[in-house]
Regions:
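Feature activates predominantly on carbohydrate-active enzymes
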Residues: 255-502, 687
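Short, compositionally stereotyped local motifs that mark structural "simplifiers"
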Residues: 730-835
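Active-site neighborhood of glycoside hydrolase catalytic domains
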Residues: 460-583, 589-595, 600-602
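Asparagine-centered strand-capping/turn motif at beta-strand->loop junctions
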Residues: 48-56, 471-473
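Short acidic, flexible loop segments centered on an aromatic residue
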Residues: 37, 54-87, 128-130
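Low-complexity, acidic Ser/Thr/Pro/Gly-rich terminal tails and inter-domain linkers that flank the onset
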Residues: 22-41
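Acidic, contiguous N-terminal accessory segments
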Residues: 22-23, 125-268, 272-300, 556-564, ...
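Flexible, acidic glycine-rich loops studded with aromatic residues
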Residues: 554-771
């Protein structure tokens, strides 16, 4: 009976196509979710596919291809004559249509199926559709849309309502500007008594500090109307004074009635003083007021204040990375971890190995991946530009390193090995096949990364079965050494030392190498490797020798220091015998309830220098609630801006309000390890991350970058929050809410309007407002007080010309009210409906 239903749907589609107007405007692929069957973790969905090409799609010759992080078709529910294939990864899917599925141009095919898995967000659903026509050997990329709001069972998703958000924002209220910070991250000490001076043109001197005068002049001038000069023929009204009592990055900034003074011991401190001054002057101009007469004494809490940008999953070019560096410098971050490779992309040009970027730098339709990688994360057929394609040239990388150095930022190259290496493996396999075809086996095997005879079986965290390098062949180490040395050469061209090299090494699945003939021989002939379980540690020591030989220090994710076992991401045991490697772990996997919340403290207490990269606090792609329209992931929980801001790096258990919300009691906390006072020096700092699986446009990238980067900078630089010293959740909550309200106001009223004017601007997040109607009165709130809220009563989506919400207003109970947040430029966010 069920199959008859689906066959009838197919028959119906043919009847529908006869009525379809050839000129009707339509989105080629409509994916309609008919039912969310939450109890059974299934969905009933309907595909509507329109041939929008000028060529007939003859049955038996065409197939539909797409990616979807969640959702796998239940084969038994497919219409007869339709074949489903899961290819690999997370996820590349294909439907091949049999002989009776003939679609002329503008014809439409409609059929229904069931899927395993509930799509938690649109960004994790189907995307990147294209049709491959095997007869014409062409691909047609198809625009798509997901329709879901009228699905049965939608109430089971617990989607946040306008009223829910209104409650979430209940502790937020608009503050007067004299209660707001002039500088973020908040300086260690500041004295402002409410007095102002008149603005004036600036003429500064650097008094011998090794900073490029034109660079400071240009940077300080950005966004300002006053003139900035450094002219010895004029009187100086901004003086820089050397103060050797200050630490390297510390500074004093004093704005007086007639002059400005900066004190520092090193150029880094001078630079950060100018960044603080820049913020103050920009805010003063935006608010059309004088300059505050203020004294600031400032120094960072942590030496390492990092941001990692993933350009491997989805690629963003040099120009975007330079803009990121500008914003990092503004907020006093000093380490840029550039993730250049992963399973889904190789993004750095390497001389002598063109396959890395020709194959590994592109995704799209392929029969054997000798020309490019399979589509992933909505990259489409590859015949059009997409964020799945692209790479940095060597010169691009040199310019990035130089640009960063000028802004007191160190660039750290991240080249994943031996895990998350699928792009490199496939590229070198293409090289192998090409040279083998012409009989040059020496060249074919020189940089080989796979064992063709390996029968090992595994699935990585992203569901790949072939993303781990065969580390039992000299060719693998020859390859990695070449990469290290070629990247070192780029640093030399940038006149900058390569101090650190990141091997990644996260999420190594259990199972590789166990059935590899190469590895069996390698272990049998090497007394330093007793068993296959010892192979990975031996590999790490070889990598360390290569990296230290290049004058750098080896760093990577903490996974490399944990026992490689069937426990995989649940493993807790530390490999203390690797302490002599001087390896710095970036400790990321601390999901609440996962058992590794205290891992960084355990590592530091054992003597490892470590950096906190907490997924439950500092991953910008973690969404904040169940909203279907959010971009990002939630595997490490739902993380709000307030959660990130409220994280105490030296003791993640100190925020009692957060523990209470998570249901974590004191007995559970008592089982965890805390950072010992004598190990505090091993805690080097913190790093934020932006992974790009769901980031398919610059707009999405910007919305996840900002204001996350600003919030993170507060934790990286500013002092510990005073409310954390209070003993209980009950005591902490009012103080926490008050402090967050002050910070959120500083974001909404000052920082977000300011960054709109800097470095080309950024489309920062505009959170959905919250609202209720109580006794015919509309009440609205927003996450960042100071941003505008506009509304309509006629059912139309609000624009920048719509009425501005300023106070509660009377509304008709029968009206459908649309509400939307706006920034200072008039750009609007997503709208909500209040009934």
């Amino acid at each position: 009976m069920r199959m008859k239903k689906y066959l009838w749907a197919v028959l119906a589609c043919y009847l529908l196509t006869q009525c379809q107007s050839p000129n009707s405007e339509t989105i080629p692929v409509i994916f309609t979710i008919d039912t969310f069957d939450v109890p059974n973790n299934q969905m009933e969905v309907t595909f509507s596919i329109t041939n929008n090409s000028n060529t007939p799609w003859e049955g038996g010759t065409w197939s539909l291809h797409w990616n979807s992080i969640f959702g796998e078709i239940i084969i038994e529910t497919l219409p007869e004559g339709v074949e489903y294939t899961y290819v690999d990864g997370q996820q590349y899917l294909i439907l091949a249509f049999g002989e009776k599925y003939n679609l002329k141009p503008n014809d439409k095919l409609i059929f229904s199926v069931k899927q395993k898995g509930i799509i938690p967000r649109l960004a994790m659903g189907p995307m990147g559709f294209f049709v491959h026509n095997d007869k014409t050997k062409t691909n047609t990329d198809l625009e798509s849309k997901i329709i879901w709001k009228n699905a049965k069972g939608i109430e089971g998703l617990n989607l946040p309502s306008a009223a829910d958000r209104y409650t979430t924002y209940e502790t937020l209220e608009l503050l007067s500007k004299d209660q707001l910070d002039w500088v973020i991250p908040t300086p260690e000490k500041q004295n402002f008594n409410g007095e102002y001076r008149l603005p004036s043109a600036l003429n500064f001197e650097l008094n011998g500090f090794k900073i490029d005068t034109n660079f400071i002049k240009t940077r300080l001038q950005e966004g300002l109307t006053i003139k900035v000069n450094s002219d010895e023929k004029l009187d100086y009204n901004l003086s820089v004074i050397k103060n050797n009592s200050l630490s390297e990055e510390a500074y004093k900034l004093i704005i007086l009635e007639d002059k400005i003074k900066i004190e520092a011991s090193e150029s880094a401190g001078i630079f950060y003083a100018f960044e603080s001054l820049h913020q103050i002057l920009l805010i003063a101009e935006n608010e059309e007021k004088g300059w505050p007469i203020i004294t600031i004494e400032d120094t960072p809490r942590f030496k390492n204040r990092g941001f990692m940008s993933d350009v491997a999953r989805n690629f963003y070019p040099k120009e975007k990375l330079l803009q990121i560096l500008d914003y990092m410098a503004l907020y006093k971050l000093n380490r840029f971890d550039l993730k250049l490779t992963d399973d889904d992309g190789w993004r750095i040009e390497i001389p002598g190995l063109p396959e890395l970027t020709q194959v590994g730098g592109n995704r799209g339709y392929t029969q054997d991946e000798n020309d490019r990688l399979i589509p992933m994360y909505g990259s489409g057929s590859g015949d059009q530009d997409s964020s799945g394609n692209g790479f940095l040239t060597g010169q691009d990388f040199v310019e990035i390193v130089q640009y960063a150095k000028e802004r007191n930022i160190e660039v750290i190259p991240q080249i994943s090995f031996p895990s998350h290496a699928r792009a490199a493996i496939k590229a070198m396999k293409a090289r192998y096949d090409n040279f083998k075809a012409i009989g040059n086996m020496e060249a074919a095997t020189k940089y080989m990364l796979h064992d063709p005879e390996d029968q090992s079986q595994y699935r990585s965290a992203q569901l790949y079965s072939d993303n781990v390098v065969c580390i039992c062949d000299a060719s693998a180490y020859r390859f990695y050494k070449k990469i290290i040395l070629e990247i070192k050469t780029l640093y030399e061209k940038a006149d900058t030392p390569m101090k650190v090299f990141n091997i990644g090494a996260d999420e190594l699945p259990y199972g590789p190498w166990q059935k590899s003939p190469k590895c069996a021989d390698y272990i049998a002939n090497n007394k330093a490797i007793p068993t296959v379980n010892d192979l990975y540690n031996y590999n790490l020591r070889l990598l360390n020798t290569m990296i230290t030989g290049a004058g750098a220090r080896m760093v990577g994710w903490e996974d490399a220091l944990l026992v490689h076992s069937e426990n995989e991401q649940s493993e807790l045991n530390i490999k203390e015998d690797l302490l002599d490697l001087d390896f710095i772990p970036y400790v990321w996997n601390n999901s609440w309830g996962g058992g590794r919340e205290d891992m960084i403290y355990r590592l530091a207490n054992k003597g490892f220098k470590a950096i906190m990269s907490n997924s439950s606090a500092f991953y910008f792609d973690m969404v904040d609630d169940y909203d279907m329209e959010n971009s990002g992931m939630s595997w490490s929980g739902y993380v709000t801006y307030k959660d990130s801001w409220g994280t105490e790096p030296l003791n993640v258990f100190a925020n009692k309000v957060k523990l209470q919300a998570l249901g974590i009691d004191e007995a559970t906390v008592a089982t965890k390890e805390f950072l010992k006072p004598e190990a505090k020096g091993n805690f080097l700092g913190i790093q934020s991350q932006l992974w790009t699986e769901t980031i398919t446009s610059e707009e999405i990238f910007d919305g996840l970058l900002m204001p996350n980067l600003i919030v993170f900078s507060q934790r990286a630089w500013a002092a510990k929050e005073p409310w954390l010293e209070l003993p209980s959740a009950k005591d902490q909550k009012p103080a926490l809410d008050k402090a967050w309200n002050q910070f959120a106001n500083s974001l909404g009223q000052r920082q977000l309007p300011m960054i709109n004017k800097l470095f080309g601007g950024v489309e920062h997040d505009l959170p959905k407002p919250g609202g209720i109607i109580d006794q015919d009165t509309l009440y609205l709130r927003q996450q960042f007080p100071g941003l505008e809220i506009r509304y309509t009563l006629d059912g139309i989506k609000p624009s920048k010309e719509s009425p501005l919400y300023e106070k509660p207003l009377k509304v008709s109970i029968n009206k459908t009210i649309h509400v939307r947040g706006f920034d200072a430029t008039g750009r609007g966010g997503k709208s909500i409906i209040i009934n």
